Each structure stands twice: as structure tokens, then as C-alpha cells.
Amino acid sequence: FMSGDALSICQAVKANRGKVIVQVDRLVDTPSRPRNAIIPGCLVDAIVVAEPEEKNEAYKALTGSFEIPYEEWNQWSEKLEQVSAKQPKNTTVANIIGKRAAKELRVDDIVNIGIGIPETVARFARKSGMLDMITLTVESGGIGGFPVSGEAFGAMIGAASVYDMANQFDLYDNGGLDVCFMGALEVDKEGNINAHRGPGAFAGIG
């Protein structure tokens, strides 16, 4: 699941002389079939065996392993927000922006939802009953469904498809979007945008 992203990241790291550390559930003595080996050993510098973790039931909604009816999206979204360490934007300003931006949506639009305030656009699309008339996407590879807000942003509830991030950006770069709502770290009065670095923080992804 989403294994292509892991390969793309490993290839990029090695191409830039970085070190690749792979986290796995377990080590095995019997080699996998070649077609099942997503990351070749020559790209791996170290392996870490992860300790078993207790999994919250709410996160099952994000696996894509079972279908979630449209009528249950609200219920699952609320469950996920309750267990999220990072709460979604819910300020007056964020809601005003999100509500206004959602009015730009048209039937059959393919839409990219960015992190931060753009998450509110998805919420207002849901409240207005437009979710089943448009296709929401997120950069991490989810298409269709409803983007999860807060800590788990990047995942989708009720996704129609989940594929690799590189394929998602192929869709974006080739003009497959009708509208895109993006967040920003800083914006000045002239509309210049800083999406890379803030005070006392690591460089953002831009």
C-alpha cells in the first residue's frame, strides 16, 4: 500500500548522497518474490524493526481496505478529529475564507485541497451537499472522498482511489485540476508568498 512513494523517496535520497533507513514490521529468512520487493537492497543503508503499536480503531477508515458509505463520512471525520493531536483550523477567519472559497466549486470539478485553511473548503463543500458532485484530491495520492483534517491530513475518508504521490503530481502538472486551494506560511500585502521557511522552524516543503 503506497509502496511506490517509499521507492521514489529512496531513489531521491540516494541520488543526493543521502542515507536510507527503512522501518519494517519484521525480518524474514525467506526472500520475497522479486515482483514483491519494492525497494531493492542496494538502496538501503539501515533497517529498523518497529515495535508493535496499539492502533486506534478510527484510523481504519483511512486504510482504503473497506468502503465507507457517503452517509458515514461525517461520523468517521468526527472520530478522527477527536483522536488527532493537531486540531483542524476552526477560527472565524479560516471559516470565512473557507466558506467563500467553496462558492468557487462547480459540478464535476476535480479539486486539490492543500493543508491548513484550505481544509475548511472541504468542510464547507460537505455542509453544502456538493461532495458527491465534485472530486476532491490531496497531494499524497488520495482521489475522491473527503480529506481528513488536523494531524491525519493527507489521508482520505471514502477515497475512490489511492495511488502514489508521483502519479498524483502527474495529474496536477498535466493540467488535470479544475481548481486548487493552497495554504501558505506567510503572505504579504503585495501577494508575495513564503511557503518555505518560518522563524525557528525547519524548511517547509514549499
Positions of PLM-derived features:
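N-terminal active-site beta-alpha-beta segment that forms phosphate/nucleotide-binding
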Residues: 79-165
